Amino acid sequence: MVKQITDKLGRPIRDLRLSVTDRCNFRCDYCMPKEIFGDDFVFLPKDELLSFSEMERIARVYTHLGVKKIRITGGEPLMRRDLYKLIAALNEIEGVEDIGLTTNGLLLKKHGQKLYDAGLRRINVSLDAIDNELFQSINNRNIKADTILEQIDYAVSIGFKVKINVVVQKGVNDDQIIPMVQYFKDKNIQVRFIEFMDVGNDNGWDFSKVVSKDEMLSMIQEEFDIEAVEPKYYGEVAKYYRHKDNGAQFGLITSVSQSFCSTCTRARLSSDGKFYGCLFSTVDGFNVKEFMRSGVSDDELQAKFEELWNIRDDRYSDERTEQTVAIRKRKKINMNYIGG
């Protein structure tokens, strides 16, 4: 039986994001800049990560509190060995209606078929440019955009539903908006443009680098005949638009200019097993891993999850506009731990 719970702001819980690793094979400046995450950087040892059985248990308990959707994140989740085994286990949980994965796409040909066979059907690929030279400068690993586009084509060919996520930075890749809208329109793949977010302590965020949703929409409307699409469900973060000629859609995510805190239904477990109520958390999360490993029962674990949600009052994006300077000085949790 599902127990309906809400947080301090009346928001239900519907989504669980599981970060399965803090490692990544890219070094994008806004997430894991190479100057900080160099060759000598020490990542979490294996025993500090949640095991697949622990993640399965967490997900199963969360379904009793209303979780229906699970997204696997990182770091780069495809760097976690045997990830397909976790997907298979999550697919067996009663109450889980949807499982998704966010990836940079580099390893899709290597692992995609096993993931599909395990029951994964939806993938979001982070791709910030389709210009090869620009994309190489963004990922700092000399990976061409063409390489990722080939991986995307492969994923689509074996049956995955794919969406593309683009973090837009003014003066960096905002000139990619129109080419990417056109490219993925022709492919009939949804591309979503995300306002550059203030996540973590190392990404050099500055408001002047933000290209707002209204700016992006204006650019796109000058080139394409589009119409707005009604939201599909409560808490949907992207505002979607449809091309009138072929029906292909794209989305704009207003993570900075128009907060969606009031409808956020996500709980997050970091790669080291801590609970966070917000991607922009500024305090260390409750250590679920240690709590579980102390020998608690499922009932005790559920009670703790309920307690953590009941006291949740995170609304960082709302607060940013109210007291930007004070909030920018707070220490935040880096995205490779908490998951995008």
From Swiss-Prot:
Looking up InterPro entries in the UniProt record yields:
Aldolase_TIM, Elp3/MiaA/NifB-like_rSAM, MoaA, MoaA_NifB_PqqE_Fe-S-bd_CS, MoaA_twitch, MoCo_biosynth_MoaA/MoaC, rSAM
Q: Could you tell me which pathway this protein works in?
A: Cofactor biosynthesis; molybdopterin biosynthesis
| Residues annotated as domain Radical SAM core | 8-227
The processes (GO biological process) annotated in the record are: Mo-molybdopterin cofactor biosynthetic process
Q: Which cofactor does it need?
A: [4Fe-4S] cluster
The catalytic activity, as recorded, is: GTP + AH2 + S-adenosyl-L-methionine = (8S)-3',8-cyclo-7,8-dihydroguanosine 5'-triphosphate + 5'-deoxyadenosine + L-methionine + A + H(+)
Q: What class of enzyme is it?
A: lyase
Q: How is the cofactor bound?
A: Binds 2 [4Fe-4S] clusters. Binds 1 [4Fe-4S] cluster coordinated with 3 cysteines and an exchangeable S-adenosyl-L-methionine and 1 [4Fe-4S] cluster coordinated with 3 cysteines and the GTP-derived substrate.
| Key words, A-Z | 4Fe-4S, GTP-binding, Iron, Iron-sulfur, Lyase, Metal-binding, Molybdenum cofactor biosynthesis, Nucleotide-binding, S-adenosyl-L-methionine
Q: What is its EC number?
A: 4.1.99.22
Q: Which residues bind GTP?
A: 17, 71, 102, 163, 266-268
Give one Pfam family, short name only. Answer: Radical_SAM
The GO molecular function terms of this record are: 4 iron, 4 sulfur cluster binding; cyclic pyranopterin monophosphate synthase activity; GTP 3',8'-cyclase activity; GTP binding; metal ion binding; S-adenosyl-L-methionine binding
**UniProt: S-adenosyl-L-methionine binding residues:** 30, 75, 126, 197
- Record keyword 4Fe-4S present: yes
Binding positions for [4Fe-4S] cluster 2 per the UniProt entry: 261, 264, 278
User: For [4Fe-4S] cluster 1, which residues are the binding ones?
Assistant: 24, 28, 31
Functionally, this protein is described as follows:
Catalyzes the cyclization of GTP to (8S)-3',8-cyclo-7,8-dihydroguanosine 5'-triphosphate.
Assigned protein family: Belongs to the radical SAM superfamily. MoaA family.
HAMAP family reported in the protein's UniProt record: MoaA_B
The record describes its quaternary structure and partners as: Monomer and homodimer.
Protein's name in the database = GTP 3',8-cyclase
